[in-house]
Swiss-Prot record:
Alphabetical list of Gene3D superfamilies matching this protein: PurM-like C-terminal domain, PurM-like, N-terminal domain
Catalyzed chemical reaction(s): 2-formamido-N(1)-(5-O-phospho-beta-D-ribosyl)acetamidine + ATP = 5-amino-1-(5-phospho-beta-D-ribosyl)imidazole + ADP + phosphate + H(+)
Xref: InterPro entries: PurM-like_C_dom, PurM-like_C_sf, PurM-like_N, PurM-like_N_sf, PurM_cligase
The keyword Nucleotide-binding belongs to this UniProt entry's keyword annotation: yes
Protein name from the UniProt record: Phosphoribosylformylglycinamidine cyclo-ligase
Gene name linked to the record: purM
CDD domains assigned to the protein according to its UniProt record, in alphabetical order: PurM
EC numbers: 6.3.3.1
GO molecular function: ATP binding; phosphoribosylamine-glycine ligase activity; phosphoribosylformylglycinamidine cyclo-ligase activity
Listed NCBIfam families: purM
Organism superkingdom: Bacteria
Similarity remark: Belongs to the AIR synthase family.
Enzyme type, top EC level: ligase
Amino acid sequence: MKETKITYKDAGVDIDAGNTFVQMIKPLVKATSRPEVLADIGGFGGLFSLNMGKYKHPVLVSGTDGVGTKLKLAFLADRHDTIGIDLVAMCVNDIIVQGAEPLFFLDYLATAKLDPVKAASIIKGVSEGCVQAGCALIGGETAEMPGFYTGDEYDMAGFAVGVVEREKIIDGSSITVGNRLIGLASSGLHSNGYSLARKVILEHMGLGIDDELPGLGKTVAEELLTPTRIYVRSVMNLLRDFNISGLAHITGGGLLENIPRVLPNGCKAVIKKESWEVPEIFRIMQKAGNIEENEMFRTFNCGIGMVLVVPEKEAEEIMIRLSGLNETAFVIGEVAKCDAGKECVELV
């Protein structure tokens, strides 16, 4: 009797598909390269040579993140070429708030069954995000895990490393009463609040992924899969010429939870709600889901993706510079004295 020979592919892991995928993404990775990158992908580790001569006391800043349940919408729409931009954005926008220039990025992609074409589409987005952020994609991991994920679903994580001079680290310690708060417009929901957004739009409103959102002229997929805005180049430009006291990336927790992360004791942020036009998608969700205002501001970015805390005397010049950088910006409030035990963010 002939014995059956079982292979790794029979168990659900296709090494050949993995090799095909690596060859497909090499041009995408190369497009992100910087002079400091010393090796192509495929090695056991990514090599990046830090030019120590450029810095007096360099400090490496790292960040890791994912894109949450925004992935569920990518699955529904079968659209995978922009979700990688979100992944990069969530990581690099986090590290620039401490003044760090993003240097390199790594990604992790896990799926039940590797589809090289789909996976390459995902990495196309990662590559585009890295180009926007000016960082190199120097490595990653693609895990084929049969029986662990359902159907064609996958999960992603990203890892960014940047550098900042020790004396130029932005930690909020120089924030003082009277500083102005400048909000940089978001491109939409970015990558947070999607569990609530899906519940309201898909369940409560009963819309499908290709249905048009009332009053927007866009489908659910077009609006909710809009990539997260990457603020690296604009923020780095400002840091060269202006005193930025603090920065807050408005992610999960919204304005109410993220601004306090950079405020020193005794300070609060006074946010003027009428100082910017909240994008219509947030109004639609708030009305359809009967969501309280406070819940909106602690779940979604409500149109503000990054907040800068700046000296009052520099606010006007910074606004002019931001306009020249094609950023839509608003002076959304100021820093005020906060009594002990009081809320750190006040909406007025």
